[in-house]
Design a protein with these regions (language model features):
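A short, surface-exposed alpha-helical micro-motif characterized by mixed small hydrophobic
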Residues: 534-536, 786-788
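Conserved catalytic motifs of ABC-family nucleotide-binding domains
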Residues: 489, 741
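Catalytic Walker B motif of ABC-type/P-loop ATPase nucleotide-binding domains
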Residues: 493-497, 745-748
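The feature captures the beta-strand-to-loop junction immediately N-terminal to the Walker
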Residues: 365-367, 622-624
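ABC ATPase NBD Q-loop/coupling interface
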Residues: 389-406, 646-664, 807
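Transmembrane alpha-helices and adjacent helix-loop boundaries
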Residues: 2-318
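ABC ATPase C-loop
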Residues: 486, 737-738
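Helix-to-loop junction immediately C-terminal to a conserved catalytic motif
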Residues: 380, 637
Length: 827
């Protein structure tokens, strides 16, 4: 089952070893020196490849570990100790220092980590200068003895040792890459969130990578000292650190021989261009830019991706059901998951409160409503509850996500979190480690590989398993993520929107799979917007409203519950001010949407939608979460490109226009979640709305008009918008949209998260805008609320318009509730 890359590795290393040994005995003394420097640079490159290629960290301070290795080796050999003892001592010391540096440094990532490693290199450099009694200060260490063995030429001996070290480093990397350690590092690199949900502690993986990288660099440095016979702090310039990183990136990070190719470049190019030494960094900088432009994965990385294609390996047509059942039912948590009165606040917002649930083994539970993903994040350890208990055999509340995963909870995500550079099979195999690294070179057994293939077949994946997961289609990504979660052998499986973007046929297959998993004894907790799926497979539903449970029951009980219907459609307490007079505007459509199709994955989220908005109308788009309402508004505003169909604004096509151009033409979006600029004042937030206009703006007069419309904002006009309440921020967002003087104001979920009082004030303002002749297109989860102010409405279900008509007609339509809660519902 080994792919071509795996088979080529050991053979290629052997060929390189043989070629290098021949070269050692064939080269003259100067060429031999250059060859040895290339070998040592390759070892450093392999070390950095562990850090960059496997764990995704960056270090511009590896010259410090190179120097540490060189000085320790020099001091030991000058003290009369043999080189064979000095080399491992130098490597171990560098590795230990690397681990100590990594533990605090890896609390940060990206550019911050790079800055810490740069600072470390300067600390080491100045320590070498100031610690004169040991390091010789600026004068350095001289007379470093050459190694001796059987009367061999010391230069040849050093070259052979450097070659052996390079070959050993390559063999080490090749074994590490395919081991449990390597899989864990690559998983953390691709997605720390997903890695934690499989039981991996990212700090441990990254610390090990840093330590191994520093160890290899220290080993290389230990041979530099006898090679040069003299070292001082200037032997280790900071610019060399940059060149080491460049060698890995240009050669191809994550590839076996990329660092070797990169080492040849950074050592040989200066030799070939010795007359232009002062331009060395400039030349390498240009080289880096050219390579990344032509080959963004590095030279060897691009070659491997384009020309080395493994023979496709697919899951078996027949599944060993007994093996899968034994594996998935092999947990001890027969009493299931207990959640008691959990809650959490974010700032001043109570996101969830008093949530309790018992999910027995072998059951499918469907939390739904506002706050469901927050509850999922608390169960899986990504959020720590402020109150309450979570138990699965033992208390879990407050444990980090990786410990929660090891306790028997696995999950998927709304947006798939696969390890993109890893193969489909490795994505599943890494989950079987259950967060444990094992021995350094341990590999997946044949039995594990066969089980992984069975799990992929179980979920319905039929594609190649030895291709990168990032190349998968959307539906296959969903299936592989579920298979990966199952590979962790959880007692509880949390599924967050698993049907998003799936076709109806794929969704039906998912329903069958979920029932099969429950039959294996798994507890399945399903968060899903597809209410037909939820109602079909769930044994019980927990319905949340603003993070607070309102009912628990069977699907049939939930569908009949008046509190649920009110939560999904909106209550009827609010009474909007009726229109001053019935709408009697022009029938020349201001906005026309024809056969609109919007794709995010394998299946369209909006399919052949047609709608019309006339001048002066308030039109609402209604439907359950995930029906496609917000996707339509984002597409109209130019934030997402339609797959097909047309959008006409005043009879001009705008479906291919940019978001800024569409705003300039007269469509202003008030986005979901308000999205004010928190550090700007209310006044500045409002002014930003007028920037798309092409006429002269009388800012003071127009802001005064906004303040008259929303009197609450007057006393807060100079306050940072981030300090306002949610309702006040929504008023700022609406005011910002009005400052654009739009032809149509698009409003996306304006009532979301607001108190009843604030909703009333906001909707009174929308009714006033309607009566003034402002054209509005409104999306709101609260159907009854939207129908209070709308003239007409369209009802969406799974991306299709299933009903349209006047607001009065739809308020009396019993089928409206079915669009939100599934079939068989009556309001």
């Amino acid at each position: 089952m080994k792919n071509l890359k795996t088979q080529l590795g050991p053979v290629s290393i052997g060929v390189l070893a043989l070629t290098s040994v021949v070269a050692v005995f064939a080269l003259d003394s100067y060429s031999l020196l250059v060859f040895t420097l290339c070998a040592l640079a390759a070892v450093v490159g392999v070390g950095l490849n562990v850090l960059i290629g496997l764990s995704g960290q960056i270090s511009f301070g590896h010259i410090a570990f190179y120097a540490i290795g060189a000085y320790i080796s020099a001091l030991m050999t000058l003290a009369g100790l043999p080189l064979w003892l000095a080399v491992p001592a130098a490597g171990l010391a560098a590795g230990a220092i690397g681990a100590l540096l990594a533990i605090p440094a890896l609390r940060v990532t990206g550019s911050y980590l790079a800055m810490i490693t740069i600072a470390f290199s300067f600390v080491v450099h100045h320590s070498l200068i100031e610690w004169r009694d040991v390091t010789g200060g600026s004068n350095g260490l001289m007379g470093i003895p050459l190694p001796e063995f059987a009367g061999m030429d010391p230069s040849i001996l050093l070259a052979l040792i450097a070659t052996a070290l390079m070959i050993a480093a390559l063999g080490f990397y090749q074994r590490l890459h395919h081991s449990g350690w390597g899989k864990a590092m690559r998983a953390v690199k691709a997605s720390e969130i997903a890695a934690r949900s499989l039981g991996f502690n990212p700090v441990v993986s990254k610390t090990l990578a840093f330590a191994l990288s520093a160890l290899l660099t220290g080993l290389a440095g230990s041979l530099l000292a006898p090679l040069l016979m003299f070292i001082n702090p200037e032997s280790f310039p900071f610019s060399q650190s940059i060149l080491f990183v460049l060698a890995v990136i240009v050669g191809g990070s994550g590839t076996l021989f990329g660092p070797v190719l990169g080492a040849l470049l950074i050592v040989l190019v200066p030799e070939l261009l010795s007359d232009f030494a002062e331009y060395r960094l400039l030349i390498f900088s240009v080289l880096l830019l050219v390579v990344l432009w032509i080959a963004p994965n590095g030279l060897l990385g691009t070659i491997a991706r384009r020309w080395i294609k493994p023979t496709a390996l697919t899951p078996p047509a027949r599944i060993n059901t007994r093996r899968v059942a034994d594996y998935l039912s092999n947990h001890t948590h027969r009493d299931g998951l207990h959640i008691r009165d959990i809650g959490i606040r974010f700032g001043g917002v109570q996101a969830a409160q008093h949530v309790s649930l018992h999910a027995p083994a072998g059951s499918i539970i469907g939390p739904n409503g506002a706050g469901k993903t927050t509850v999922l994040n608390m169960i899986s350890g990504f959020y720590t509850p402020d109150s309450g208990q979570i138990e699965l055999g033992r208390a879990l509340a407050g444990l980090p996500a990786w410990k929660t995963a090891r306790a028997g909870i696995a999950r998927t995500y709304q947006t798939t979190q696969l390890f993109g550079e890893m193969s489909v099979l490795d994505n599943v195999l890494v989950a079987m480690q259950k967060g444990r690294l094992g021995l350094i070179f341990s590999r997946s057994s044949t039995a594990q590989r066969e089980l992984a293939l069975d799990l992929l077949a179980l979920v319905g994946y039929r594609g190649a398993v030895n291709i990168p997961a990032e190349d998968l289609a959307h539906v296959d990504r969903r299936l592989v993520e579920i298979a990966r979660a199952l590979a962790a052998a959880p007692a509880v499986l949390l599924l967050d929107e698993p049907a998003a973007g799936l076709s109806r046929r794929d969704t039906d297959a998912l329903a069958i799979l979920l029932k099969q998993l429950a039959g294996f004894g798994l507890t399945v907790i399903l968060v899903e917007h597809d209410m037909a799926l939820v109602m079909a497979v769930s044994e019980r539903l927990l319905v949340l409203d603003a993070g607070k449970p309102i009912t628990v029951g069977t699907p049939a009980e939930v569908q009949r519950d008046e509190r649920v219907i009110a939560a999904y459609l909106g209550g009827t307490d609010y009474q909007a001010t009726p229109r001053n007079e019935a709408w009697n505007g022009s029938r020349d459509a201001r906005l026309q949407v024809k056969d609109l199709v919007i794709d995010y994955g394998a299946a369209p989220v909006v399919n052949k939608v047609n709608l019309v908005v006339n001048p002066g109308e308030l039109v609402a788009i209604l439907g359950a979460n995930g029906a496609g309402k917000s996707s339509i508004l984002q597409c109209l505003a130019g934030l997402h490109r339609a797959s097909s169909g047309s959008i006409l604004l005043d009879n001009e096509n705008i479906e291919q226009a940019s978001a800024s151009s569409i705003a300039g033409q007269g469509l202003a979006l008030v986005p979901e979640g308000r999205q004010v600029f928190p550090y700007l004042s209310v006044r500045d937030n409002l002014l930003l709305g007028s920037y798309s206009r092409r006429d002269v703006v009388d800012a003071d007069r127009e802001i005064e008009a906004i303040l008259q419309r929303f009197p609450r904002l007057r006393d807060r006009i100079d306050s940072p918008a981030g300090l306002l309440s949610g309702g006040e921020q929504q008023m700022v967002a609406v005011g910002r949209g009005l400052m654009a003087k739009p032809k149509i104001l698009l409003l996306d979920e304006p009532s979301l998260g607001l108190s009843p009082l604030m909703i009333g004030e906001l909707y009174d303002a929308l009714a006033a805008l309607r009566d003034e002749g402002v054209t509005l297109l409104l999306v709101d989860q609260m159907a009854n609320l939207a129908l209070q102010v709308a003239d007409r409405a369209y009802v969406l279900e799974t991306g299709h318009v299933i009903k349209s008509g006047s607001a009065a007609q739809l308020r009396e339509d019993s089928d409206l509730a079915a669009a939100y809660l599934g079939e068989g519902v009556s309001a």
